[in-house]
Design a protein with these regions (language model features):
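Short, internal active-site loops enriched in acidic
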Residues: 9-11
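Histidine-acidic metal/acid-base catalytic patches
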Residues: 13-35, 41-139
């Protein structure tokens, strides 16, 4: 069973160098990075930094999209409650996915509280997310 660590803005592991240092410090091949595309992109990183880490260091991808600049006053609130469908934002998602290993597990982390509160049901929120993720993965 593998373990992953996640980079997030303003947290202890907040940049690729710290990710790599943590993985090397632990010294286990089953410790890898979870790439949360929102956190990665909003931290100013893209596919280039993922390629530099190497696909063997990537263990999981949490896929969502967002704008490059904040859409809410609180980053935490935006990350927890209002992410965007893959392809609806500004992140270089196709390039990020290309840097990941071909067999990486990809999960969707796309909370949409505003839509839920406006009466849009879970399946109607989920369908476009799954369709967009499939399209990205099939490129």
């Amino acid at each position: 069973m593998g373990t992953t660590i996640e980079l997030a803005p303003g947290m202890t592991i907040g940049d690729p160098a710290t990710v790599l240092a943590a993985i090397e410090h632990v010294g286990r091949p089953d410790l890898r990075l979870t790439v949360d595309t929102m956190h990665w992109g909003r931290s100013g990183y893209g596919a280039v930094e993922l390629y530099k880490l190497g696909p063997e260091k990537i263990g999981y991808v949490q896929l969502s999209d967002t704008t490059l600049k904040a859409r809410a006053k609180s980053y935490l609130q935006e990350a927890m409650y209002e992410r965007m469908i893959p392809g609806d934002g500004e992140l270089p998602l196709a390039e990020m996915l290309a840097a990941a290993p071909g067999d990486v597990v990809i999960g969707l982390e796309i909370p949409m509280r505003g839509l839920a509160e406006s009466g849009v049901g879970p399946m109607d929120r989920l369908r476009p997310c799954v369709a967009a993720a499939r399209e990205l993965c099939n490129r």
